[in-house]
Regions:
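Bacterial N-terminal signal peptides that target proteins for export
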Residues: 2-13
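Sec/Tat signal peptide C-region and signal peptidase I cleavage site
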Residues: 21-27
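Electrostatic cytochrome c docking/interface patches
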Residues: 33-70, 126-130
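The canonical Cys-X-X-Cys-His
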Residues: 67, 71-81, 91, 141-145
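Gly/Gly-Pro-rich "capping" loops immediately C-terminal to redox-active cysteine motifs
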Residues: 68, 83-126
Length: 188
């Protein structure tokens, strides 16, 4: 009826099927229950994007003179005195253009839009207290960094109207693509 070889093959196939079924049924780990479902209020609080044209900038104001002390208190430990180097990298100064072997990618030589300074600072600085700066403080720090890079004067006020008007030295240094955003993703 069954040969030894056929019987062994059949038993092996049944065992493999049972083992595979056991692994699939009982071996799968449950999905970890991490986080929570984002509420509309959560999403609204995260919607802090600033666009190059200034869309999304909050009300507030600041000057480089106001930002200097704040920089010394909040930023110099990582970015050095006056933003010229440190473990967090230089934000100002630099003598090597972007086409050199070791280019300086500081704000004045690399960043194409002044509004990006505000956006990045508000989201990601200071590193030990993200999101802790008020809009006025971020405007003051932005003004100070622009001043340190020779782009504005010490008393020039940065706000939602003046900041997008700053023409950064490397504004035309990137290859741009036209992107059409779906209506649902355009800022309100």
């Amino acid at each position: 009826m069954f040969t030894n070889k056929l019987l062994r093959t059949l038993v092996g196939f049944v065992m493999l099927t049972l083992l595979t079924s056991a692994v699939v049924a009982g071996g799968a780990r449950p999905t970890p229950q991490l986080g929570k479902v984002a509420t509309p209020e959560d999403v609204a609080a995260w919607n802090i994007s600033i666009f190059p044209d200034g869309t999304g900038l909050p009300s507030g104001r600041g000057t480089a003179a106001e930002g200097k002390l704040l920089f010394a208190q909040q930023c110099a430990s990582c970015h050095g005195d006056e933003g010229i180097g440190g473990p967090g990298g230089e934000l100002a100064g630099g003598n090597y253009p972007l086409n050199s072997e070791s280019p300086d990618k500081n704000i004045g030589q690399y960043w194409p839009f002044a509004t990006t300074i505000f956006d990045f600072t508000r989201r990601a600085m200071p590193m030990n207290a993200l999101g802790s700066l008020s809009a006025n403080q971020v405007y003051a720090l932005t003004a100070y960094l622009l001043f340190r890079n020779g782009i504005i004067g010490a008393e020039d006020e940065m706000n939602a109207v003046s900041l997008p008007k700053i023409n950064m030295p490397n504004r035309d240094g990137f290859i741009w693509i036209d992107v059409v955003l779906p209506k649902s993703s355009k800022p309100k």
